[in-house]
Amino acid sequence: AALDYWGGKNVITCGMYRNAEDRDKIRTLTKNDVTFSFLGFTDHTNGLRIAEDSELEVVYTSDEAEIQKEITEASKISDMVVVSVHWGTENSHTINDAQRALAQKMCDWGANIIIGTHPHVIQGVEELTAADGRKTLVAYSLGNFISAQDVNSRMIGGMLDFDIRKSYEKNTVTYENVKFIPVVTHYDYSFSNIRIYPFSDYTKELASKHGVNAKSPFSYDFIVQTLKDNISDKYLDLN
């Protein structure tokens, strides 16, 4: 159903495929003479399994040979390889060893940007160096962009913002000016009127009235501290 819905929109999807042939078609987008490839992998599917007689395809993080193949192929046809990975420990700000190990491997294989999902809470942003000296930007978890959950830390998410620069003289494409822009999911009593605020537009008054306070204490200062505890000042943009 999800593939049918998004298939009718002007949206690039990756991570779930109709069959093996569809999986092998790397999704690309070219803008301003820069070609991006988009790949998606997952540690698990939240207890759901693909039926044995289904042709649907998902690439799991345990299948490192397939991941390496896809990143390598994507590198050949694009300037920037963007990888989305569903991984990490749920509800934990701590980046686990498996995340770090796979991130470094994907960096070495040719990924340029790695964006993590799944933990529901934010995790750190850092830059890795590949064996050949290339740099790879990794945001281990952007947290929840929007949710109807009832834990304070799950109300805080982020957007990753950066510029892409192409040098015709050096024949290189790089990212620069990386920013982690925080967002806050806000709802009223009993999960009503859910909306999203950029942190720059959020206020102490809104935080004091957040419906999550019924289950989990929430405040403006809590948001700031959570962000500063997990996102390097090098990337954190609170303005």
Q: What is the predicted role of each segment?
A:
Residues A1-N239:
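Acidic, metal/ion-coordinating pockets
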